[in-house]
Design a protein with these regions (language model features):
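Extreme N-terminal, non-catalytic leader segments
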Residues: 1-14
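Hydrophobic anchor at the beta1->P-loop junction of P-loop NTPases
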Residues: 17
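The conserved Walker
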Residues: 21
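Walker A/P-loop
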Residues: 26
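Post-Walker A helix-loop "phosphate-sensing" segment adjacent to the P-loop in P-loop NTPases
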Residues: 33-44
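Conserved nucleotide-sensing/catalytic segment adjacent to the nucleotide-binding pocket
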Residues: 39, 52-107
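A glycine- and Lys/Arg-enriched "phosphate-lid" helix/loop adjacent to the NTP-binding pocket
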Residues: 130-178
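NTP-dependent small-molecule kinase module
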Residues: 173-204
């Protein structure tokens, strides 16, 4: 059983906890926010909100999976590339959320799939400067079969999701490369029993 790590100094106001779908972010994200006694927001909630408030014509990237006939026939690489467009479509809104928390000095963890290193690397968010107050850490699972096993354990009623696991593995590789390019830490998702303390150390 994992022991809760001792509190370390928090030097950020907004922390982006990113990583591909199926690598284990959700389970550890809430524990990470609890450790630092800060709020946490799922970026997927913003995605659902935007999908309900827009049309496919207004935001094609957000609606592609649900409305495009091409989705069913698309390769894993094509789906991954298209999924990146979701984060790009949401970037302006996420900048506003980050700016608000920086101005109000209300610390927050933002987590989920569509957070990219370049967002945390920005020098400013509108008129609000970063000044090192926005940081990011990315959870990485290098084993495609493990991602497939995670999906099967989480959603056994759907059976093996081989193609979806491939998409997530490709995205995990892309996020790792981008994070390293921007100078943000990449933390291995396993071993699971030490992932919380390793995340805490990476962002403290």
């Amino acid at each position: 059983m994992e022991q809760e790590a001792r509190p370390l100094v928090r030097r950020w106001e907004v922390l982006l906890l990113g990583g591909a779908s199926g690598v284990g972010k959700t389970q550890v994200g809430y524990r990470l926010a609890h450790h630092f006694a800060v709020g946490i927001t799922e970026v997927d909630d913003f995605q659902v909100l935007l999908e309900r408030m827009t049309t496919p014509e207004q935001q094609p990237a957000l609606h592609w999976r649900r409305t495009s006939p091409a989705f069913a026939q698309a390769s894993a690489s094509e789906i991954m590339e298209q999924s990146l467009e979701i984060g790009h479509a949401m970037r302006l809104g996420l900048e506003g959320v980050i700016a608000s928390h920086l101005k109000e000095q209300t610390p927050l963890v933002l987590q989920r799939d569509h957070l990219y290193p370049a967002l945390a690397a920005q020098t400013s968010y509108g008129s609000v400067t970063n000044d090192g107050r926005v940081r990011a850490v990315f959870l990485h699972e290098p084993d495609e079969q493990q991602i497939a096993a995670n999906y099967l354990a989480r959603e056994p009623q759907l059976g093996p999701q081989i193609k979806r696991a491939r998409v997530s593995w490709l995205k995990s590789q892309w996020l790792k490369q981008q994070a390293e390019r921007c100078g943000f830490p990449v933390v291995l998702a396993r071993p699971w029993d030490t992932v919380l303390e390793r995340l805490i150390a990476a962002v403290s």
